[in-house]
Amino acid sequence: MPRDQSAQQHSAASTAWPPGRPPFRADHVGSLLRPPELLRAREDFAVGRLGADQLREVEDAAIREVVRMQQEVGLRDATDGELRRESWHMDFIYQLGGITKVQDDTIRVAFHNEQKSYEWAPPSAHVVAPLTLEHTIFGEAFSFLRDTATTALPKLTIPSLSMVHYRGGRSAIDESVYPDLDQFWADLAATYAEEVRRLYDLGCRYLQFDDTSLAYMNDPEQRKHVAEIGGDPRHQHERYIENINRALAGRPADLAVTTHMCRGNNQSMWAAEGGYEFVAEALFNDLAVDGFFCEWDDERSGGFEPLRFVPKGKRVVLGLVTTKHGDLESKDALKRRIDDAARFVDLDQLCLSPQCGFSSTKEGNDLTQDQQWAKLRLIVETAQEVWGSL
C-alpha cells in the first residue's frame, strides 16, 4: 500500500517540538481507579436506590478529586479518569448512530496473566443502519473536565474507529446496510471526523485515540482470529491507519492527537502479546498523529527495535511503568530502559508514561489508589531528571 500523503506532510514538519504541545515528557494514558464511593453509587443506581442526578453528583466530586491529584503530582495534562464509563471503549461505540448492542456468543474474548485467566463472550456492537453522529459523544463529560482543570491541559480519550470493526469484522456489519465495506469505512471516518470537529469546538486541544487493534495485530493468534472472521491479517492494520487518517484529515493545527496501543488491560490481565515489529513501519510512518503511547512494561511487548521506523517530528511515549500491579519501579531501571530505547530513536522524541490506564474497565487493576499515585509521581520525577523539563 502506498504511503499516506497526509502522514508524510504531517511528519515533514519542523523537528523542534512546539512548546506546550502534547504528548508531554511525563504523561499518562487516561483511566484511573474508581474510588469506592463511586463504585457503591453505581451499584445503588443499578438497583434504583440512587437517581441519575445523585449519581452525577458523586461522579462530579470524584472527577474533581482526580483532576486535583493529577495536577498535584505534576502532570501537565489531566483526564477525568474515565470515571463516568463502564469500559474504555464500548460506552462510546454504543452511542454511534447505526450501532446496536447485541449478545454475540460466537465471539469470545480471553484475558490472562501469570495467576489467572478469564474467558467470556461480552456484548458486542453490530452495525444495523448507516453510521451517523447523533450527538457529541462525551461532549458533556469533556466540558466538565475543561471547566475543572486549572493548571493542566484537559485530555479526552476515545476509542479509535478501528475498534468499531475489529472484534466482529464483516459479520458484525449488516450486508443490507453496507454491501460494500468501502462505504462503511467512508461513513465511519466521516462520523469520527465530525466528532473530532465538535470536540474541538468545545475546547478540546488534546485528543487520544485508544487502539488495541494496532497492537493486537502483532500477535499471530490475533491475526488468525482476523482471518477466521473474514479479515485480511496481512494488511488490516494498513486499512485502519488509512481510515484514521481520513478522520483526522484537515484537523486544526493546534489540536494534538495521540494514539495508545496496548495488548488488553482488564483487571490486570492481558489478551495479546508480541512486539510492534509487524505493524511498526506503517504505524510510525503513516499514522498522522503527533505521538504514540506504546506498551513496553514487560517481555510480552518485545524490544525497542521497532522504534527505528519513527520519523522526525513525532514522539513516542514509552509505557515502561506497569499498571498491572502496585510494585513501584526504580528510577534507575526506568532510566536504563529509556537509554535503551534511545539507541533506536532520538532521546528528544521520547516521553514516559504507564503502559496503559489503571482502570480500563470499572473494576480496575490490582493495585491501590496510593500505588497508582505513587507511579504517576515516579513518572513525573523521572521525566524531569531525564529531560530537564516536562
Task: Give the positions of each predicted feature.
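Domain-level signal for soluble alpha/beta catalytic cores
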Residues: 2-390
